[in-house]
Amino acid sequence: MKKVEAIIRPEKLEIVKKALSDAGYVGMTVSEVKGRGVQGGIVERYRGREYIVDLIPKVKIELVVKEEDVDNVIDIICENARTGNPGDGKIFVIPVERVVRVRTKEEGRDVL
């Protein structure tokens, strides 16, 4: 099993969520996060003064999937989150050793 973590633009969340759900990947965790990368910060104005905001609001989507589903999940996220501009995000794939359903204590791939 693998955990897929995708950091994407907030405005792309709904379309990515729908595409994943339509493909059968309904279990996910979504968090509001802030970060920076190549895109750097942005300049905002407040009461006539300019401020550099160096941490940009993003959304993190986390899914645990079967290893054979990882490439499909990555393709779905990329196809639906891409704008072609810096700041589109990153995807991380992390090994998962164990999954346990809290309610029943069942374990393994079947609890996904």
From Swiss-Prot:
The keyword ATP-binding applies. It is found in: Cytoplasm. GO terms for cellular component: cytosol. Keywords: ATP-binding, Cytoplasm, Nucleotide-binding. Pfam families: P-II (PF00543). ADP binds at residues 29, 37-39, 64, 87-90. InterPro entries: N-reg_PII, N-reg_PII-like_a/b, N-reg_PII/ATP_PRibTrfase_C, N-reg_PII_CS. PROSITE patterns: PII_GLNB_CTER, PII_GLNB_DOM. The keyword Cytoplasm applies. Coiled coil: none annotated. Its main location: cytoplasm. ATP binds at residues 29, 37-39, 64, 87-90. GO terms for molecular function: ATP binding; enzyme regulator activity. GO terms for biological process: regulation of nitrogen utilization. SMART domains: P-II (SM00938). Involved in the regulation of nitrogen metabolism. Regulates the activity of its targets by protein-protein interaction in response to the nitrogen status of the cell. Regulates the activity of the ammonia channel Amt2 via direct interaction. Belongs to the P(II) protein family. Homotrimer. Interacts and forms a complex with Amt2. This is Nitrogen regulatory protein GlnK2. The lineage of its organism: Archaea, Methanobacteriati, Methanobacteriota, Methanomada group, Methanococci.
